[in-house]
Amino acid sequence: LQKNFKEIVLTGVDLTSWGKEFLDQDYSLGFIVKKILNEFKTLPRLRVSSIDPAEIDYELMEVLEHDHRLMPHLHLSIQHGDDLILKRMKRRHLYRDVINFVKEAKRRRNDIVFGGDFIAGFPTEDEKAHQKSMQLITEANITYIHVFPYSNRKNTPASNMPQVQKKIIQKRAKELRDLAEKQHNKFLVSQIGTTQKVLVENNSVGHSTNFSKIKLKEHVEACTIVSTKILEINPDGLLGTTRN
């Protein structure tokens, strides 16, 4: 903050597990997020990276609802939409957990946007299971999607399961990416005509609170937050202006 930074990002392999090491305290990710915002009143923006949707952190949801310095963008570590595949991945959540998480977050903050990771072609995945991932992306309205084709690693539990043919993995990964592009484009269109707060990073390019990448028509110094009218979609995301 002393160096004029305007946004802090909390990141980690499993952010949602923070606090569980304090066996004698009932700490959670929401607790530390709230504490940071209370301690640093001049911090304009706090962003949280990847979150496990297995359980709803109601303390985090309270902060999301009442302190808009917590950015309305959450990246969920989803991986798949089929419950059996999720169990074989040893994930802690099921399809319905993702939907419940998204609904609760939306209820608290209706402008929130979600990202998610998805794996195509995990061992034993059939077409029906693959379609559950496609369905989940649409139902949960995931906007920012990272797609990873499954890659076999020796001496892992998954390597001993029936493998999906490489050409099928590639086909399903493409279908997921095509849907991801459709979802993202739909979101970009919805932003046109709105006014967004943009944190400028360099070359008059920055990110809005919902993580849209925005190029400004005017030159704006880095580390500046400006109100920006969104004009149109451009090759990198969105084009905006600081002029009324």
Predicted regions and their residues:
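Conserved SAM/AdoMet-binding glycine-rich loop
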Residues: 2-126, 138
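Active-site proximal loops enriched in glycine and acidic residues that flank catalytic Cys/His/Asp
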Residues: 12, 50, 78-80, 116-120, ...
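Generic alpha-helical hydrophobic packing signal
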Residues: 42-43, 67-70, 134, 138, ...
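Short, charged low-complexity intrinsically disordered segments located at boundaries
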Residues: 63-67, 92-93, 133-134, 202-211
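A structural motif corresponding to the C-terminal lobe/cap of the Radical SAM core domain
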Residues: 72, 84-199
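Terminal RNA-binding accessory module
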Residues: 160-244
